Every structure is written in structure tokens, then in C-alpha cells.
Amino acid sequence: MFKKWSKEQKFIAAIVLFVCLLSGLSFLFFRIFSGEKREVKVLKNGKSLLECSLQKDQKFLIMDEEVKEVSFSEGLSSLSEEERNPAKHEVNFIEVKDGKVSCTESNCNNQICVHTPPISKKTADLPIVCLPHGLIIEIVHS
């Protein structure tokens, strides 16, 4: 039914098997040790407002179309009443911590962005969206 392989056929099969094994291992090695870099990108109405590292813990205040890095203790309560007023300003606090990003506070009317769980490398497929403010927070390859 099966005929025996000649020495030449065995040698060629061994080389093909070795090349396949080597390419598979090199792919795995590259995938594991490449340290795939990802960063946070914040868009407002399609315009890029912020790009920052996912590795560094930091907090940002986004008011209208201006971005400012703030301390972790700051929030909506640290702003003036006029700045918090949703009729005058669109305010979001974005926090990058422990490799995750979240919208911790917002003065939008539905608060969906605040109640959306933090996103990380593992859940990077799903962005955080604040529809009333036209804000999209996503994790992208750098």
C-alpha cells in the first residue's frame, strides 16, 4: 500500500519539517518578546486630541477641545460651577492606570462613558464612547 521512502526523500522531508518548525518557532519568539506597543488615542468629532502611552499612569482633563494633564485627585468637583456646566463646556476626565484606560468622570447627560468598564490590551477591540461629547477613547498599535 505504502512504498518505502528513499534516503533522498527522507532527507528532503526532514529539511521541509525543519524549516516549518524553525519558522513557527521564530514567529512565536517574535510574538512573545516583541513587546507589542499600544497607546491610548482620544478623538473628538474625528479630530485627534490625545495620544499617550498605556504604560504610564496619568490623568487628563478634556474640556471642549483642550487637553490638560491633571493629578489623580482632580475631578469634576475641583472645577468651577461654570466649567462644570454642560450647557457651556464638554468635560471628560480620562484616566490611564495599570495598563487600562477609562473615562472616570464626565458632565454629559447619559454617563455611558463613565459606566463603560476600563479597556486594556485584551479588550482593545471595544472603544469607550461619549456620544453627547463626540468623544472616542481607543487603544491602538503604536
What are these regions, as identified by a protein language model?
Residues 1-9:
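Short, Lys/Arg-rich N-terminal segment immediately upstream of the first membrane anchor
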Residues 12-28:
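Hydrophobic membrane-insertion alpha-helices, especially the h-region
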Residues 23-41:
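Aromatic-capped interface at the extracytoplasmic side
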Residues 36, 72-88, 95-98:
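N-terminal intrinsically disordered, cationic/polar leader segments
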Residues 39-57:
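Short extracytoplasmic/periplasmic juxtamembrane "stem" segments immediately C-terminal to an N-terminal membrane anchor
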Residues 81-82, 109-119:
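N-terminal post-signal-peptidase region of extra-cytosolic proteins
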Residues 89-106, 133:
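Glycine- and acidic-residue-biased ligand/ion/polar-headgroup-sensing regions
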Residues 119-142:
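C-terminal partner/receptor-binding element of secreted or periplasmic proteins
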